[in-house]
From Swiss-Prot:
GO terms for cellular component: DNA-directed RNA polymerase complex. The gene is rpoC2. It is an enzyme of class 2 (transferase). This is DNA-directed RNA polymerase subunit beta'. Keywords: DNA-directed RNA polymerase, Metal-binding, Nucleotidyltransferase, Transcription, Transferase, Zinc. GO terms for biological process: DNA-templated transcription. NCBIfam families: PRK02597.1, rpoC2_cyan. Residues 7-24 have a biased composition (Basic residues).
């Protein structure tokens, strides 16, 4: 039986129409004839499974693949059930090699630390080396884990899961059985203590805590990522939702070039259509234009060594507002050419948005691990190194502190073998590091060089690290450092190292001297332990009587009474009540003052000491305060302490009882506005204290307050009188007539009031308080002295309330307070006054109040010596109650020497105090005996391994102090390497304690901080954000010239352009120049490091091309360059996270971002300057205008971020449903926009069928029907429905003036055939061009026209497939 394909059998059975046969043939399994069966014997992991399923799908279609996948699933389940793969603790096998690897790492790190100790590398280099060592160890351990499982236990559950790709990956297995590795702290810096253990061995507490940083970061990031990713997807969908495949072929000749990377294309060509024939080296055609590239063809192209392929892409598709099938290529869902009506925009948006959650927010700063980009070359044989005549190298220091040479040009490095045989050649590229010298003899397997990967200049940033001193001693510079004083713009002077060199600290015992201590011993003197090195004295500033206090803490207090004042005419009485003790001052006439500042407390200037206890100014209830004329108060900043009286007078008081209630209204027991007697119960359990008229305030059935106003009430009907006393009320003097028959005898306050009986006036009693001008004061109010501070008291009267203030209260209040206030003169601000109790000198039973001003001197007690201070001994020079003068010494402190040695004082300027001194002890020096004559000199500094005599190495670091015959005395020291440009915190000869900062190393590291990783970076690219502090870009191509600026640090870069114009680029401080003098640069190339501003880049590209090409070409080429860059950048982020996205998805989005131009000059078109418009629309407009001979529109291309592009779409319904709804709709209404409902969103919102998928062809029919006889709306054109706007000189568009008129007026005048003919002739339009269609009338029917009759072969093919009936 000849095998037929399933498809042909199906169609033939259909053609014969025999149902029986059809039913029978269903049961026969179609033989798989397309490919011969193949037998593969290998382990199938996740990747192979993918390939297997893809192969089945490609060769045998969906049904077979589904059946096979089902069978695979059953197979998997069956064996998984039998195998019972599970994880147990025993499955976690730690490789035995781990201890060796850790041991090796420890050795390397010990060696690094030793180099650091000897001052051979800087702190930064040490840190970098440690991090790199651990990173490398970790990698090697992963390999060991893989090897261990593969060799010893290939069926281990953990290994099978990770290896097959079923669950988990190697980085997780590494943490289970390898080591957890390096962790970062919250600032993103790597902690150089790695976690050496794994989860199988268990973590120590420290390691557990270090791990917790990362754990929290992971949780927080995940929570933030989901939200961010969702919003990104929404914006992408919005920008691309109207991209639908609407055409078969746009016919463009433009294309994009895809270059091979290392001779491979990978998957980048699969599913694309060829734009230009691909030919191999012999000019044989491999693939013709419009061939779809499948994986086989892709491999074939690679084999033919084709470097670049021109393919069709959505970026260059010329279909209007859509993409054509051929430019899009395969739909990746079924690996066939995409169907018409496919909503490729939404697919693109989802493909980019969906992996968003997998992207990390930020990655750690790695410690400059740059092993990936550079290849290390080792020698294959022993021999002699030769650089050759072309070589140019310069000295270079690697980040690990290894001295090497860097190649300035490309050259060949030869190794001439020592024995006969073939030598070795190494290609050295410019920028590579060479670790051997010219002419050096090397063994086999020696590292020769590190080859730089291309001339990529990494962007770097400056970072700093402190160098901390490990021992106390004296600083000495090496001459190599060449310190230089640098003044910055603020005038601060810093000391900087100009060259690489060592900074030494020579050991010694450094003493910190207290302030005002002076050395009492000469430099270079020998001292014994216990000898006085320095003395400090403390003296009294004002003098007075000495009081010695008990010691407090580690110091004793000496108090000196400088001023005192006793109040002799007042007795001090102590009373106690429930709230504690109360102190009162009582004068002979019985007036009493209550003391605020109790004895033992301290008070300052202008503070209140006591208040007069006076009941004369106390009221019975609350009320209203009025000042009578004459009474005046001082203005005060705050009314907290009341108002000070400046002029005495009368204070008037109108009593009024106020109860604040806040209870339910049902508890009220009286009526509003009725007269009540004293003692009436107004609310349950609340009684009135006075008689009068009640006012009740309530809100929402809650009683707020009840006011009782006492006085005489008179009914009154005279409206003038009622008006006169309305609102606030008035004071009426005695004898003045208020109304007929109402004449008060005393002063009253008259107010209009409404009661239950009716309106009238209430005469309220007024109490008058007389306030004197001056307050009375105890005798002896001042103590003055010639020198030092003076004391005084003054009395003030303060009113508690201002004029017209209402006091709501039931209890009484105090209207006036008389206060005693302290005044001090000539005092320092920190001086306080102490309040004390003394006995009267004549009668011991009476106590008096005494105010004293004390000078307090803290005297240090003797201290036993510690690491930074010598022991001190303090002696008091005064006795208790001794009188001292100002400037007398109260105590002296001596600093004693701890151990015997030689004293050295630092070199100081004359007026500078000495704050530290150093004693060089016996233990700070060592004496070495040389076997033969020493080769060292006095003053020379040596490190471990330097020679003492011809044979003997020295085993310590330090400075040679003396040489006597064969004995060499060495003062121990510690070298610290500092790199050029480091900031030095200490000067030569300075004394430092352990833990002091010596220098700040300034180093360059690869910029990682602002290369935002993952989602934020994707967002930055797609939103086309302008980065902060971006790189300076070259505007036009030319040759670079670099000059120094006015000051040392600044640089001026000049670019000499092709027409000899010179463009200057001033470069700011802190920017690194990325180009070299004499280099040729292109437009858009980076002159300095930093992130690139995409808008500026587009400007540079366009500006440069504009000079050489027509406007349209320049714009298209500039956009193409930018598009390529954007696609690459977005892909890089996803690739770095291991996410694979097809280029075409990103291209669809980027196309939407770059499809608009801004009109600069409208020419003779109807466009507006500043308008954003599709580039293809401008192209059409300019073409049409050029037919009429008018001036075309000038424009510049723009890049829009996805949000901006969404808001700038033609459809206002889509834009309004996205963001800024009100603004979009208002603008659309003002402009009278129409929405042509082209996209999906608009149609969904309105509730129509969406124009994609099955709705697509319906959409086409409907448009045709709508178009009718108006060629203006839709031009009949195979390239979709193109709206030609505002271009016909002989068409008028009348807008309806009102909705009613809209139904009557025809919107477009329909031209006659004659008109169209005339127009065509006028413009000389050839009927064969596409422009002809714009001026032709579309045919109304959809039948085949004569010249379009179908190809008979095509009809037969359709019949063959059963898609066309025999009729």
């Amino acid at each position: 039986m000849t095998s037929t394909s399933p498809k042909s059998r199906k169609s033939s059975s259909k053609r014969k129409g025999s149902k029986k046969k059809a039913a029978r043939s269903k049961n026969v399994i179609p033989p798989l004839s397309k490919t011969p069966p193949s037998f593969r014997n290998c382990v199938v992991d996740k990747k192979s499974l993918k390939q297997l399923v893809a192969w089945a799908f490609k060769n045998h279609g969906t049904a077979v693949t589904a059946a096979m996948a089902d069978n695979l699933k059953d197979l998997g389940f069956k064996y998984a059930t039998q195998a019972a793969v599970s994880i147990s603790v025993d499955d976690l096998k730690v490789p035995e090699a781990k201890q060796d690897l850790l041991g090796q790492a420890e050795e390397q790190i010990t060696a690094t630390e030793e180099c650091y100790r000897l001052g051979e590398i800087t702190e930064v280099e040490r840190h970098t080396k440690v991090i790199d060592t651990w990173t490398e160890t970790n990698e090697r351990l992963v390999d060991a884990v893989k090897k261990n499982f593969n060799h010893n236990d290939p069926l281990n559950s953990v290994w099978m899961m990770a290896n097959s790709g079923a669950r988990g990956n190697m980085s997780q297995v590494r943490q289970l059985v390898g080591m957890r590795g390096l962790m970062a702290n919250p600032q993103g810096e790597i902690i150089d203590l790695p976690i050496r253990t794994n989860f199988r061995e268990g973590l120590t507490v420290t390691e557990y805590v270090i791990s917790s940083y990362g754990a929290r970061k992971g949780l927080v990031d995940t929570a933030l990522r989901t939200a961010d990713s969702g919003y990104l997807t929404r914006r992408l969908v919005d920008v691309a939702q109207d991209v639908i495949v609407r055409e078969e072929d746009c016919g463009t000749t433009r294309a994009i070039l895809i270059n091979a990377e290392d001779g491979r294309f990978g998957n980048r060509l699969v599913g694309r259509l060829v734009a230009e024939d691909i030919v191999d080296q012999e000019d044989a055609v491999i693939a013709k234009r419009d061939t779809a590239i499948d994986p086989e063809l892709s491999k074939k192209i690679e084999k033919a060594n084709v470097n670049g392929v021109m393919i069709r892409s959505p970026l260059t598709c010329e279909a209007t507002r859509s993409v054509c099938r051929k430019c899009y290529g395969w739909a990746l869902a079924h690996n066939q050419l995409v169907d018409l009506g496919e909503a490729v925009g939404i697919i693109a948006a989802q493909s980019i948005g969906e992996p968003g959650t997998q992207l990390t927010m930020r990655t750690f700063h790695t410690g400059g691990v740059s092993t990936a980009e550079t290849g290390v070359v080792r020698s294959n044989l022993a021999g002699k190194v030769e650089f050759g005549p072309k070589a140019r190298v310069r000295g270079y220091r690697t980040p690990h502190g290894v001295e090497a040479q860097q190649a300035e040009v490309d050259f060949l490095l030869h190794i001439k073998p020592t024995e006969k045989g073939k030598g070795q050649k190494v290609e050295i590229s410019s920028g590579s590091l060479i670790f051997v010298e010219d002419g050096q003899e090397v063994d086999a397997d020696v590292t020769l060089a590190q080859i730089a990967a291309g001339a990529i200049k990494k962007s770097v940033e400056k970072a700093t690290k402190d160098v901390i001193c490990d021992l106390a001693g004296q600083v000495r510079y090496e001459e190599a450092i060449q310190p230089k004083e640098v003044t910055d713009r603020q005038g601060n002077i810093t000391l900087k190292a100009q060259r690489l060199g060592r900074l030494w600290v020579l050991a010694g015992d450094v003493y910190n001297l207290p302030p005002n201590a002076k050395p009492v011993i000469a430099s270079n003197a020998n001292v014994q332990a216990g000898k006085v090195l320095a003395e400090a004295s403390q003296s009294s500033e004002f003098g007075g009587e000495v009081r010695l206090r008990d010691s407090i803490g580690d110091s004793r207090e000496v108090q000196i009474v400088t001023t005192s004042m006793t109040l002799k005419d007042y007795n001090l009485l102590e009373e106690s009540n429930h709230s504690g003790e109360i102190w009162n001052l009582e004068a002979n006439d019985g007036t009493r003052y209550r003391i605020n500042s109790i004895p033992g407390s301290k008070i300052g200037n202008n503070e209140v000491i006591a208040e007069l206890s006076d009941d004369r100014f106390r009221t019975k209830t609350g009320g209203l305060v009025k000042y009578a004329p004459g009474l005046a108060i001082k203005k005060a900043r705050s009314a907290k302490n009341g108002f000070e009286v400046s002029n005495g007078g009368s204070l008037l008081w109108i009593p009024q009882e106020t109860h604040e209630i806040n209870k339910d209204i049902s508890l009220l027991m009286i009526q509003d506005r009725q007269w009540i007697e004293a003692g009436t119960e107004v609310v349950k359990d609340i009684f009135s204290q006075t008689a009068g008229i009640v006012t009740v305030t309530q809100k929402n059935d809650i009683l707020r307050e009840i006011i009782v106003r006492s006085g005489e009430f008179h009914l009154c009907t005279d409206s003038n009188i009622l008006e006169r006393f309305d609102n606030e009320g008035q004071i009426v003097n005695p004898g003045e007539t208020i109304a007929k028959g109402i004449k008060p005898e005393a002063m009253v306050f008259v107010q209009t009031i409404e009661t239950t009986e009716g309106k009238g006036v209430l005469l309220r009693p007024v109490e008058e308080y007389t306030i004197p001008d001056k307050a009375q004061l105890p005798e002896l109010s001042h103590v003055t002295q010639q020198q030092g501070p003076s004391l005084g008291l003054k009395a003030t009267q303060r009113l508690g309330y201002k004029d017209g203030e209402l006091i709501k209260s039931v209890e009484g209040v105090e209207l006036l307070k008389t206060q005693l206030i302290l005044e001090t003169f000539d005092t320092t601000p920190q001086m306080t006054v102490d309040v004390e109790v003394t006995e009267d000198q004549s009668t011991k039973t009476i106590q008096r109040l005494r105010l004293v001003i004390l000078e307090s001197i803290l005297v240090r007690r003797d201290t036993i010596s510690d690491s930074s201070h010598g022991s001190t001994h303090t002696e008091l020079q005064v006795k208790d109650q001794q009188i001292v003068k100002a400037g007398d010494i109260v105590a002296t402190t001596q600093i004693l020497c701890k151990e015997k040695g030689i004293v050295q004082l630092p070199e100081m300027k004359e007026d500078e105090p000495i704050r530290r001194l150093i004693v060089e002890r016996q233990e700070d020096t060592v004496t070495l005996t040389a076997a033969s004559k020493p080769v060292v000199k006095i003053g020379q500094r040596v490190i471990d391994g330097d020679l003492l005599s011809n044979e003997e190495p020295i085993n310590c670091c330090g400075e040679i102090e003396a040489i006597k015959e064969n004995k060499v005395t060495l003062r121990l020291g510690r070298p610290y390497m500092v790199s050029p440009d480091s900031v030095l915190h200490v000067k030569n000869g300075d004394l430092v304690q352990r833990g002091d900062g010596l220098a700040l190393l300034v180093f360059e590291r690869q910029k990682t901080g602002d290369i935002v990783q993952g989602l934020p970076r994707i967002e930055e690219l797609l939103e086309a954000r302008r980065p902060r502090d971006s790189a300076i870009l070259c505007k036009r191509r030319g040759i670079v010239e670099i000059n120094q600026g006015d000051d040392d640090d600044s640089v001026v870069v000049k670019v000499i352009e092709s027409d000899d114009l010179i463009e200057e680029y001033p470069i700011l401080l802190g920017k690194n120049v990325m180009i070299s003098d004499g280099q040729e640069v292109k437009a858009g190339e980076l002159l300095t490091d930093g992130p690139v501003n995409p808008h500026e880049l587009l400007e540079c590209f366009f500006g440069d091309l504009r000079d050489r090409k027509p406007l349209m070409e320049a714009a298209q080429e500039a956009i193409a360059k930018l598009q390529h860059r954007l696609v690459t950048e977005v892909q890089n982020v996803y690739k770095s996270q291991g996410v694979a996205i097809d280029d075409k998805h990103i291209e669809v989005i980027v196309r939407q971002m770059t499809s608009k131009v801004r009109i600069e000059d409208a020419g003779d078109t109807t466009l507006l300057p500043g308008e954003l418009i599709e580039i293809r629309q401008v192209e059409d407009t300019n073409q049409a205008i050029s037919i009429t001979g008018g001036a075309p529109a000038e424009f510049t291309p723009v890049l829009l971020g996805i949000t901006k592009a969404s808001l700038n779409t033609d459809s206002f319904i889509s834009a309004a449903s996205f963001q800024e709804t009100t603004r979009v709709l208002t603008e659309a209404a003002i402009e009278g926009k129409s929405d042509w409902l082209r996209g999906l969103k608009e149609n969904v919102i309105i509730g129509r069928l969406i124009p994609a998928g099955t709705g697509f062809s319906g959409f086409v029919e409907e448009l045709r029907a709508e178009a009718g006889p108006h060629p203006d709306i839709l031009a009949e054109d195979p390239a979709g429905y193109r709206r030609i706007q505002n271009l016909r000189p002989d068409y008028t568009v009348e807008m309806p003036s009102s909705p009613a008129a809209a139904n009557l007026t025809s919107v477009l005048d329909d031209p006659s055939d004659a008109d169209l003919e005339a127009t065509r002739n006028r413009h000389g339009i050839d009927p064969s061009t596409s422009n002809f269609a714009a001026f032709a009338r579309p045919s109304g029917d959809d039948n085949f026209q004569e010249d379009q009759s179908p190809d008979p072969a095509a009809l037969e093919g359709l019949q063959e497939e059963g898609l066309l009936s025999d009729e």
